[in-house]
Amino acid sequence: MEPILAPNPNRFVIFPIQYYDIWNMYKKAEASFWTVEEVDISKDINDWNKLTPDEKYFIKHVLAFFAASDGIVNENLAERFCTEVQITEARCFYGFQMAIENIHSEMYSLLIDTYVKDSNEKNYLFNAIETMPCVKKKADWAQKWIHDSAGYGERLIAFAAVEGIFFSGSFASIFWLKKRGLMPGLTFSNELISRDEGLHCDFACLMFKHLLHPPSEETVRSIITDAVSIEQEFLTAALPVKLIGMNCEMMKTYIEFVADRLISELGFKKIYNVTNPFDFMENISLEGKTNFFEKRVGEYQKMGVMSQEDNHFSLDVDF
């Protein structure tokens, strides 16, 4: 049995820390806590009213996917990961991740509630998993992995793919709006959320490195390429980014670029060997290994949380 999954009678007490790298990730998550009340969306309505019908359609569907997906991630954490993983440091991270995912879901729901005035349309968007085939396909894939009989390692990769690949193209599409100077509330919340998801993805990679018997490279590649195909179809066929003026082929390449970055972080060879086609995505938090403590998004960090004097903690650890 994997040591991180083995019964641990000390799991109810945090100290003494046994896994400093995992604990450090938890402290990073704690330092980046935020709430929806801190995001000003009052100026978005003027921009929203100026968008074309295609642009509105695209944003509404992306928000509908996001609003549902965080709940799926949380269900996996509650039903599987939090009960399987026996080391306290990881349980701290997963517990905090659940709180953050709730904030993300609330943020997306609030954005839908603010932009969409028709109550029937709101209900349609809030129930996207049932009402939208393109969203249902992604949700079904993620939910399948919650209940899969595969080992923790495989399911860890699947949910790294959900947070690292299924979200990537949609994040990029919203950053595209930022590049155009539109929707400041939506784009700022997107910065915060994409940074959080980058950290969650980094954490999955860290947990993977703690496995003594990880899934094979072939298995990892299969899961990741499957997720890439679904995400590419989502943003180039079902909900094409050309609706907001983006290039569909470049979006396909970007999703492959993100997948390569993920599989490299897991310690395997790249699959696609492509470069990032979107210059405006070079510095966002899905880059992994983010430096958001030195220069946090919106100059925003809980004061003092990371000011550790204990020599065991290092911000230079190569995750």
UniProtKB/Swiss-Prot annotation:
Its cofactor is Fe cation. It holds the Pfam family Ribonuc_red_sm. Keywords: Deoxyribonucleotide synthesis, Early protein, Iron, Metal-binding, Oxidoreductase. CDD domains: RNRR2. It catalyses: a 2'-deoxyribonucleoside 5'-diphosphate + [thioredoxin]-disulfide + H2O = a ribonucleoside 5'-diphosphate + [thioredoxin]-dithiol. Binds 2 iron ions per subunit. Fe cation 2 binds at E101, E163, E197, H200. GO terms for molecular function: metal ion binding; ribonucleoside-diphosphate reductase activity, thioredoxin disulfide as acceptor. This is Ribonucleoside-diphosphate reductase small chain. The gene is OPG048.
